């Protein structure tokens, strides 16, 4: 071997497995305004120190691997590595802790939720040194927020388009969700809109099945919209689900909706994917369409307490990717603690600036600067007797989305819609007059029934 190519044992670095905390646990680190901050709930394997597990999360979700590699010398790890900068125990849990990780902004592609999630949660959740891992919250820095378009239009522009102010918007999901012909589907849409609803909705799994192809559904729903608008003098809409097997097909359906002149389309953003959702959001802004977002599949990700991601993270990601509405669930009949947590991420959807508040599950102060807000959609098992609570809890900037609570009315679809509208207007009027909706809600609804046709 020539002297030029001879490898000397004393040259290079010491290979082998090294503790992550030696490089990635930095409690002295002061976070920067440009860092993306993450709060992970960590459940480690027995016998592993919290500092090592927190550092492992930071390493495996940024620049690290299980050993030192020679190409580490070709870059600046101090500039690009994630850092576990704080660890705190989870109250009431002996084997869990919250690891706070800071990521330099240069690790992420501008305007890409897909890349952000691929980096932060794409690999580390399968790490065998952890029993479970949950991403509880993210702080998105202003510098990164400004690289996103966000919702196509936002709350105020939507109200201006619809010319509807001072109350929540009313919607209804057409049931049965599967099996209706396009013509019968359009009939149900017309009856609900004519009865007083602002919107009707495709169910999340209505795409283009053999019993009802998408183009037929779009045509009959557009007819229902225009007929109900002519008869009521109000602007109406139906969430036409543009979700499809390819991005190209999705955009084709959105183009057809625009050509029909309808005001809004819909997308299943988790099953459809963030890249598809961002593409559709950009199309909707460029072409004047509102965008309703359904969160189908969210419980696969957010239901487990110890593993996955909290919905507040998915809600923040949606605001960045783009959507004018998103289903947020409802707190009616739930525990008070769940109510506070739900309203925490509802505020993250609507407000420009949200202070850190751990009692509501908000781990970081979030500044959205000028990014438009998203209307939360309260849905799932609600009916007119929930209207006082829904009006009080969600306020005016929301969509109250019924299904069986409209279509299950014993007199039919249109009377069900009338009941929804009468109950809502009665509750809004009572609230504006200073009445206590929590205490007097039932009486308010019964009074309204006397005057409802």
Curated annotation (Swiss-Prot):
Modified residues (N6,N6,N6-trimethyllysine): 14
E.C. designation(s): 4.1.1.39
Active site: 175 (proton acceptor), 294 (proton acceptor)
Location of this chain's protein in the cell: Plastid, Chloroplast
Keyword flag Chloroplast: yes
Cofactor note: Binds 1 Mg(2+) ion per subunit.
CDD domains: RuBisCO_large_I
GO MF terms held by the record: magnesium ion binding; monooxygenase activity; ribulose-bisphosphate carboxylase activity
UniProt record similarity statement: Belongs to the RuBisCO large chain family. Type I subfamily.
Subunit architecture: Heterohexadecamer of 8 large chains and 8 small chains; disulfide-linked. The disulfide link is formed within the large subunit homodimers.
Misc remark: The basic functional RuBisCO is composed of a large chain homodimer in a 'head-to-tail' conformation. In form I RuBisCO this homodimer is arranged in a barrel-like tetramer with the small subunits forming a tetrameric 'cap' on each end of the 'barrel'.
Protein name from the UniProt record: Ribulose bisphosphate carboxylase large chain
Species assigned in the record: Galium palustre (Common marsh bedstraw)
Gene responsible for this protein: rbcL
């Amino acid at each position: 071997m020539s002297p030029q190519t001879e490898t000397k044992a004393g040259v290079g670095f010491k290979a082998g497995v090294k503790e992550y905390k030696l490089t990635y646990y930095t409690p002295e680190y002061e976070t920067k305004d440009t860092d993306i901050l993450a709060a992970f709930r960590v459940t480690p394997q027995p016998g592993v120190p919290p500092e090592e597990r927190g550092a492992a999360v930071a390493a495996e979700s940024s620049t690290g691997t299980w050993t030192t590699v020679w190409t580490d010398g070709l870059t600046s790890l101090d500039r690009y590595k994630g850092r576990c900068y704080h660890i705190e125990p989870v109250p009431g849990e002996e084997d869990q802790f919250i690891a706070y990780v800071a990521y330099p902004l240069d690790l992420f592609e501008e305007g890409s939720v897909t890349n952000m999630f691929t980096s932060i949660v794409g690999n580390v959740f399968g790490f065998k040194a952890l029993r479970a891992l949950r991403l509880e919250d993210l702080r998105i820095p202003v510098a990164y927020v400004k690289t996103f378009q966000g919702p196509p239009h936002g709350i105020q522009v939507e109200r201006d388009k619809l010319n509807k102010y001072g109350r929540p918007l009313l919607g209804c999901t057409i049931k049965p969700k599967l099996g209706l012909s396009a013509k019968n589907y359009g009939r149900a849409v017309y009856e609900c809109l004519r009865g007083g609803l602002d919107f009707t909705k495709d169910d999340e799994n209505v795409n283009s099945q053999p019993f009802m192809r998408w183009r037929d559904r779009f045509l009959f729903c557009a007819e229902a919209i225009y007929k109900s608008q002519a008869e009521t003098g109000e602007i109406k809409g139906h969430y036409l689900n543009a979700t499809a097997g390819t991005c190209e097909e999705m955009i084709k359906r959105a183009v057809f909706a625009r050509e029909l002149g309808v005001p809004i389309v819909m997308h299943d953003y988790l099953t459809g994917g963030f890249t598809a959702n961002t593409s559709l959001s950009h199309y909707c802004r460029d072409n004047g369409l509102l965008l309703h977002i359904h969160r189908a599949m969210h419980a696969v990700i957010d239901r487990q307490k110890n593993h996955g991601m909290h919905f507040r993270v998915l809600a923040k990601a949606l605001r960045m990717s783009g959507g004018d509405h998103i289903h947020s669930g409802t707190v009616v009949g739930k525990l008070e603690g769940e109510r506070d947590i739900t309203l925490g991420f509802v505020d993250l959807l609507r407000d420009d600036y949200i202070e850190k508040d751990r009692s509501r599950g908000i781990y970081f102060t979030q500044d959205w600067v000028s990014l438009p807000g998203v209307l939360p959609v309260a849905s799932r098992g609600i009916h007119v007797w929930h209207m006082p609570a829904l009006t009080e809890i969600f306020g005016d900037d929301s969509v109250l989305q019924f299904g069986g609570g409209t279509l299950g009315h014993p007199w039919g679809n249109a009377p069900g819609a009338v009941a929804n509208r009468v109950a809502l207007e009665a509750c809004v009027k009572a609230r504006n007059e200073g009445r206590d909706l929590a205490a007097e809600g039932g009486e308010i609804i019964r009074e309204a029934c006397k005057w409802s046709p």
